[in-house]
């Protein structure tokens, strides 16, 4: 097998990997070229004969580039839909988790709502705080510790709003107090 045949698939792969902005340029160029081959302006510009000679190649470039642009667009739309579905599912799980807080989680989240504080210092070794951070209910607002392993954590705006509307979720149950 010759070197030329071994290298041919790589240029095809390179074309497939082109950014949509370059594909759009190819589509516009080849589309205008095809159009100019059929109108008097092409003859006026002196390119009608050249376009007609390469019409097959221009047509292939036009079809391929518009197909790739369309596939990029469909992929972009599908990613957007997937992200929306994932976000909605995640939000549903987060709200469900807030409806089933244990005592330690209520202790961590209560100051944000009842004391109206924006930041609470929590130990980075506190597993409950880390779980709330993993669930994206709170987030570490600073990577610099003030006191050893204690870092400032803020509550996510959506969680603050949800818990402010549902303060009863942070109250201790009467059975536990008795």
Swiss-Prot record:
Main location: membrane
GO CC terms: plasma membrane
Compartments (UniProt record): Cell membrane
Annotated InterPro entries: SieB
Topology versus the membrane: Multi-pass membrane protein
Keywords, sorted A to Z: Cell membrane, Membrane, Transmembrane, Transmembrane helix
Pfam families: SieB
Domain of life: Bacteria
Membrane spanning residue stretches: 22-42, 57-77
Name the UniProt record assigns to this protein: SPbeta prophage-derived uncharacterized protein YopH
Species name: Bacillus subtilis (strain 168)
